[in-house]
């Protein structure tokens, strides 16, 4: 029986152990998509408690606690003490067996704090105090955590109207780890509520210093902000969309739709889809002009619980996997850009695992030989960011594409304790490849190639692909 969370955790063969310990584990981390708060990095924030860094904003844990019968005040309540919240999480952890949270929890305790104990009600106070004692020291600050995990680059997620002041402050401080912005223009496509859209466009007008009175003005303002992001080192965009949009439209129609929505009128469903379709193309062309990589996270049904949405807002644990027949629209969107010669590097992330093989074959339609893996099948995202989800994504890509050209893992996280997800991914990758070598499905004579493949997927592919 193997020791839980031992040095060979998830590594079931000697070859897997060699691949991980001698190669994958030695690679720095490039976290090319995350949701860290830039101000925390700029200010080198010192966390007040393990509850703040671990449970604050972690909707994965909140979902588990609610499922375990824990009252909401222990998840998101403002009048509940840090210890009370941690205690309720410790009571929940034993019930997360076979849930990835059990692995994440103990891997984070081990790698960040050197704690090998199992978290449960009996060990809760001891672990709480030990973590808090360490968090009070400078090496456990926001920057200290990034250094601890050998992070080389992080890309945050930023709105076009963000000032990026904290990226600038961090860079000018001489911090050795790069923190770069990512362009996330979701709100400029959110035309369902006229008042919200108009309020956003007014903010865009203010920060861009462009007087916006029509659609062309809005695009001018967006281009100005796009240029500004590029000046601050941005190399990626990201789009959170329910599905792909590829309706037929004319320029005149889009200008008329803008005038209608900006004037405060509700749009028809058809008009909403046309506007979103046009914006995806325009934004994709902007990214192509600068050589950026565009990312698409699609397939979530968000804010399902309307009562809790009113109480807590978005991103609080009430989202789920959607069912969208999106293959044709995705193909049409990519083809429109490709037909113009304006399809930039692209990463597609699906939330429904039923789409794995669809995406793995879709990316092959638009590889053009300009660079290896120009169109990528993104790593398992959100609910798929776990062992089974990772393996299914890796297997689909292996069978239908080129795994060796994959740009690898990202945290997609708001937490400075989430970097062990890279380790978890690397162990999973090495286990798959090691098993194939030992079963004779990959020749042992190609071991040097397999070793390089592991290092490439862990680090070098991303470094070269994004030109960090």
PLM feature spans:
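Short, basic/hydrophobic alpha-helical segments
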Residues: 333-339
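A short acidic, glycine-rich active-site loop
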Residues: 268-269, 318-324
């Amino acid at each position: 029986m193997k020791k839980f969370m031992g040095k060979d955790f998830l590594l079931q063969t000697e070859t897997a152990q060699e691949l991980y310990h001698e190669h994958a584990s030695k690679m720095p981390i490039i976290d090319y998509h995350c949701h860290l708060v830039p101000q925390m990095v700029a200010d080198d924030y010192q966390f007040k408690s393990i509850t703040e860094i671990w449970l604050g904003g972690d909707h994965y844990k909140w979902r588990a606690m609610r499922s375990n019968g824990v009252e909401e005040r222990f998840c998101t309540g403002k009048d509940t003490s840090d210890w009370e919240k941690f205690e309720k999480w410790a009571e929940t952890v034993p019930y997360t067996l076979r849930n990835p949270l059990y692995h994440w929890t103990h891997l984070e305790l081990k790698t960040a704090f050197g704690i090998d104990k199992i978290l449960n009600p009996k060990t809760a106070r001891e672990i709480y105090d030990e973590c808090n004692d360490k968090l009070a020291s400078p090496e456990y600050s926001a920057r200290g955590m990034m250094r601890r995990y050998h992070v080389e680059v992080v890309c945050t997620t930023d709105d076009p109207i963000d000032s990026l002041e904290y990226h600038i402050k961090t860079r000018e401080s001489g911090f050795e780890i790069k923190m770069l912005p990512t362009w996330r223009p979701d709100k400029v496509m959110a035309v369902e509520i006229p008042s919200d859209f108009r309020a956003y466009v007014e903010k865009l007008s203010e920060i861009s210093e462009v007087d916006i009175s029509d659609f062309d003005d809005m695009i001018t303002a967006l281009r100005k902000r796009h240029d500004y992001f590029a000046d601050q080192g941005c190399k990626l965009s990201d789009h959170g969309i329910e599905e792909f949009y590829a309706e037929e439209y004319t320029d005149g129609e889009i200008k008329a739709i803008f005038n209608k929505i900006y004037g405060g009128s509700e749009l028809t469903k058809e008009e909403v889809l046309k506007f979103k379709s046009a914006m995806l193309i325009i934004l994709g062309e902007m990214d192509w002009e600068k050589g950026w990589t565009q990312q698409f996270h699609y397939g979530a049904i968000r804010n399902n619980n309307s009562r809790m949405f009113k109480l807590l807002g978005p991103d609080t644990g009430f989202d789920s996997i959607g069912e969208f027949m999106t293959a044709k629209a995705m193909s049409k969107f990519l083809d429109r850009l490709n037909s113009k010669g304006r399809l930039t590097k692209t990463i597609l992330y699906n939330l429904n695992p039923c789409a794995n093989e669809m995406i793995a074959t879709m990316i092959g339609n638009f590889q053009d030989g300009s660079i290896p893996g120009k169109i990528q099948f993104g790593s398992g995202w959100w609910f798929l960011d776990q062992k089974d989800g990772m393996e299914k994504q890796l297997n689909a890509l292996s069978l239908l594409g080129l795994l060796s050209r994959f740009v690898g893992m990202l945290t997609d996280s708001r937490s400075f304790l989430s970097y062990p997800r890279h380790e978890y991914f690397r162990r999973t990758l090495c286990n798959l490849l090691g098993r194939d070598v030992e079963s004779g499905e990959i020749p042992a004579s190609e071991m040097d190639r397999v070793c390089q493949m592991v290092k490439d997927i862990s680090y070098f592919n991303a470094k070269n692909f994004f030109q960090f």
